[in-house]
């Protein structure tokens, strides 16, 4: 008889399936991701720290997992939910199965459940707390635990680097503030010749200025931006002194530093096919997204920020630019991985902004 596993939700519902991955059972906020591919990059994205991911695509793991495509050295999510997990993947780059990697990193999961039903529940009711148990007799106690437990709202401290390190390049010097960065951000900067110094999330503005970088990148990361107060103060300190570009959580922190506010979304944006409109050009780009918080558009009225991009599906803010200083941000992931590369050009715009600022500084000092 096959062993059973149960996914239990705080609203009192539960789903019966089969165990995959680790037997180290956990709980967390359950969310859904609509991407059809890129499950390796998804489970290793630090922005999912503490969450349980429901994959809406029905077959996960069919091309295996390799050592090169991780977005972080160690995945930090709390679980996965799939309709079916492939045990016999086929791909020339495959080194391990999805199940083996979940076991290696102590990530529990469940398969054989109705992921469409779970996704509809989250879409209609909002994200929920959820947990796993292998004993049906424990379901009631798990529901009570979920209804009373407070989940962490600031996971940045968990995933940020503890000390600075360098990813060497031959050109511009960029400081990347690590709130839970994806490795492909570093790859994209290195591909443009940037010498990247990755620093902890709580690095002060004074410390960054002493490094004399040409630019600063504010990375993605997990959790509630309102909880990362130290970064808001740092951004205030570098604005106007060093050009910077914010992505995802970095975008939200940029907005908060200028007096805007954020809010928790009902079910967030998580997937690789979210359409975003550039308000300047009118062009639509398909983007990779992973966020459960957004910036309140009304709160931008009395700031020096202008909205540059909006989400087509729900009209939420997807991009900002300072009206007079060299700083901009996007809510989505231009580095993709997984997802389309429609917005990869934003890294080039960042480089152009740095060079324009350097030229202006040279002219002013001449």
Swiss-Prot record:
Sequence intervals crossing the membrane: none
Alphabetical UniProt keywords: Amino-acid biosynthesis, Arginine biosynthesis, ATP-binding, Glutamine amidotransferase, Ligase, Nucleotide-binding, Pyrimidine biosynthesis
Active site location: 248, 333, 335
Reactions catalysed: hydrogencarbonate + L-glutamine + 2 ATP + H2O = carbamoyl phosphate + L-glutamate + 2 ADP + phosphate + 2 H(+)
GO MF terms, alphabetically ordered: ATP binding; carbamoyl-phosphate synthase (glutamine-hydrolyzing) activity; glutaminase activity
Pfam family, one: CPSase_sm_chain
UniProt-listed InterPro entries: Anth_synth/Amidotransfase (IPR050472), CarbamoylP_synth_ssu (IPR006274), CarbamoylP_synth_ssu_N (IPR002474), CarbP_synth_ssu_N_sf (IPR036480), Class_I_gatase-like (IPR029062), CPSase_GATase1 (IPR035686), GATASE (IPR017926)
Role played: Small subunit of the glutamine-dependent carbamoyl phosphate synthetase (CPSase). CPSase catalyzes the formation of carbamoyl phosphate from the ammonia moiety of glutamine, carbonate, and phosphate donated by ATP, constituting the first step of 2 biosynthetic pathways, one leading to arginine and/or urea and the other to pyrimidine nucleotides. The small subunit (glutamine amidotransferase) binds and cleaves glutamine to supply the large subunit with the substrate ammonia.
Family to which this protein belongs: Belongs to the CarA family.
Assembly and binders: Composed of two chains; the small (or glutamine) chain promotes the hydrolysis of glutamine to ammonia, which is used by the large (or ammonia) chain to synthesize carbamoyl phosphate. Tetramer of heterodimers (alpha,beta)4.
Annotated protein name in UniProt: Carbamoyl phosphate synthase small chain
């Amino acid at each position: 008889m096959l062993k059973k596993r149960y996914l239990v939700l705080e609203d009192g519902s539960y789903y019966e399936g089969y165990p995959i991955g680790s037997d180290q059972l956990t709980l967390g906020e359950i969310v859904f991701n609509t991407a059809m591919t890129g499950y390796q990059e998804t489970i290793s994205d630090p922005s999912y720290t503490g969450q349980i991911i429901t994959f809406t695509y029905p077959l996960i793991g069919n091309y295996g997992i390799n050592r090169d495509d991780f977005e972080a050295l160690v995945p930090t999510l709390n679980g996965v939910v799939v309709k079916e997990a492939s045990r016999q993947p086929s791909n020339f780059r495959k080194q391990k199965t999805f199940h083996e990697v979940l076991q290696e990193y102590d990530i529990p999961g469940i398969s054989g459940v109705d992921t469409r039903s779970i996704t509809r529940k989250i879409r209609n009711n909002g994200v929920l707390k959820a947990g796993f148990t292998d004993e049906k007799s424990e379901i009631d106690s798990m529901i009570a635990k979920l209804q009373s437990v407070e989940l962490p709202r600031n996971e940045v401290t968990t995933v940020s680097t503890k000390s600075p390190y360098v990813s060497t390049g031959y050109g511009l010097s960029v400081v990347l503030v690590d709130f839970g960065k994806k490795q492909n951000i570093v790859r994209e900067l290195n591909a443009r010749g940037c010498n990247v110094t990755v620093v902890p999330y709580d690095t002060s503005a004074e410390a960054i200025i002493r490094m004399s970088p040409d630019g600063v990148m504010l990375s993605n990361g997990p959790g509630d931006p309102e909880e990362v107060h130290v970064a808001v103060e740092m951004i205030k300190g570098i604005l106007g002194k060093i050009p910077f570009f914010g992505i995802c959580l970095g975008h939200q922190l940029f907005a908060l530093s200028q007096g805007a506010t954020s809010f928790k979304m009902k079910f967030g944006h998580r997937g690789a096919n979210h359409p975003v409109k550039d308000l300047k050009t009118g062009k639509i780009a398909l983007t990779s997204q992973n966020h459960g918080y957004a910036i309140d558009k009304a709160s931008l009225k009395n700031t020096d920020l202008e909205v540059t991009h909006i989400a087509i599906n729900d009209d939420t803010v997807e991009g900002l630019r300072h009206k007079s200083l060299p700083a901009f941000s996007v809510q989505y992931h231009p580095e993709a991985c997984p997802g389309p590369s429609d917005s990869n050009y934003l890294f080039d715009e960042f480089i152009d902004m740095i060079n324009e600022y350097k030229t202006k500084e040279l002219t002013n000092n001449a």
